[in-house]
């Protein structure tokens, strides 16, 4: 058992499933050394469909998530919340959905 902070490379389920749960010859973030051929096949199938058939890929991700939950492969103890204080004189500040505690400032303007 271990605790660590990890953020996805990009805002897509494949970043979570591939990095944390897919078995590989070279282990990177699958630190539990999980080796589930059924889960690997579903992840691979979802990756292949992500661009061409998003709905089918989403169904694969739902199935993969069910396998992960049913087998208790991961246990999320908590999710850290972040608070941002933004001056009323500015607008356009948005949070990055893939990275908590990262704010996107490229659209910031004054009111």
Locations of regions flagged by a protein language model:
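Short, solvent-exposed loop/beta-turn-alpha elements that line the ligand-binding surface or hinge
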Residues: 15-45, 49, 79-111
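Periplasmic binding protein-like
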Residues: 1-25, 60
């Amino acid at each position: 058992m271990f605790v660590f902070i990890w953020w996805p490379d990009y805002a897509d389920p494949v970043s979570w499933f591939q990095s944390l749960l897919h078995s590989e010859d070279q282990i990177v973030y699958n630190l539990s050394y999980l080796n589930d051929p059924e889960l690997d096949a579903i992840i691979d199938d979802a990756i292949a469909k992500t661009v061409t058939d998003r709905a089918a890929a989403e169904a694969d991700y739902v199935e993969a998530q069910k396998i992960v939950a049913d087998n208790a492969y991961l246990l999320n103890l908590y999710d850290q919340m972040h608070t941002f204080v933004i001056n009323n004189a500015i607008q356009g500040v948005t949070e990055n959905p893939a990275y908590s505690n990262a704010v996107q400032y490229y659209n910031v303007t004054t009111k």
